[in-house]
Amino acid sequence: MKIALKILKWIAGALLGLIIVIGLCWWLIPDEELNPDARKFTDIASVPPAAKNAYFMIWGFVASPELDPHVVGQQIVAAHDRILAAEKDLSRFKVDAFYGEHKLTMPKDSKRFCDAEKENCLLVYHAKRAQMLEQAEEKKLYLARYRKIREYEDFSGAMSQTTFQTPVPAWLPILHMSDLVDGEIADRMKTKSTQQAALEELDAEVSSWRRLLQGDDWLITQMISVATLGRKYRLASEIMDAYPEVVAAHPALMTKITAPLSPAATNVITSMGAEARFTIGTFASMDTNRRFLADSFYEDLPGLPLRAAFAAGAFRPNASTNDGYLIFKEAIDLFAKSPKQVLEGRAALVARQEKLSRLTLGAVFYNPVGRITNATHPSDFTQYAFRIDDIIGFSRLLELKRRIIEGNIALDKVAAVLANSGAELMDLYTEKPMQWDAATKRISFAIQGKRFPVFGYVTLDHFK
């Protein structure tokens, strides 16, 4: 019995010693050298925002009526950047403190007036005319602020640096004003004498959201711009169906509204680069982010010192930065190619990115926090590039529709028009003419972003 106990004690001691040795080895393994290319990529200096940056108005949009929203936005950005410059925690930074006592708030259950994915918004806006006009009157000050945004030329992001704690502007009220403006456009289109004013408003809307799409390098803002531009384009398509005569009556305006977006007019490579620097930068600040990651992944460990100490072995910032750089670099390199080439290279890119973020035994032992965090990135970054390509394709469909109406093209001639359209109006993903279905009177292409199916077609409903 005593011999058995001695053996058990010996085994237990040996196991404990082995665990201690493994733990020390794990804790003492040095971090790898930082890839010079990753360092160069993340060290790109930010450009201070111009004084007339639209983002100041966007940040201050919901401020109390007595406050200047542009000034409020400047105060928010300056306070945010001061905190970051001092390397302080942003968790206590509250933008609400700048908005005053009577800031604009939206009900949490607020819904859009129209579901552009399922409804004809022109008809919905007509049906909800009284409700929308009433809200427009109630919020006329904020509608004026919304229209003021269109006067800006600089739409680049105002923050000098962003982190995982940087707040997002209050977009919901801005999008609500966008809907109210669309309702006013729809209402004015019903009367011939106000149609020009309606189209001028729509042109201003399209131009403003195009500039935001091109100027900003924040991926979330680009996706908001894509969705909103899609609603504007869908409304333009519905207007051409209901009032095809406006194409001939207002040719210059309609040509501006339907002018196709070009890849150069978007910002996907820059925004993906900014997204990469933001994500990789999460690993750059040792004290703040090691503490954050320790809390996130090991919150059950008692006491912050123990969690931070555990993270010292579980998290290696250079290795994490190097892995993150490789994940993003391949995506950015692919996005520099044509949409057709991106589509063809999509599967290979996803496979390589999944391999880089795979939780192998060696990776988990060496850098579990970094590898787990990198594994949380989307494995398919192409979905964001394709959403932008989809809106470009949608703008091409809209321009084709305008030309068909302008040329009074018969239904049996549409296929020939599509076949003879130039490269600037082709399907981006096949580099061939758009598809035509005479039975449904629909011109289309196969979208790849998957988020907005209605971007993939226009219907020639002006044919009665």
Feature-to-residue mapping (PLM):
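Short acidic linear motifs
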Residues: 2-464
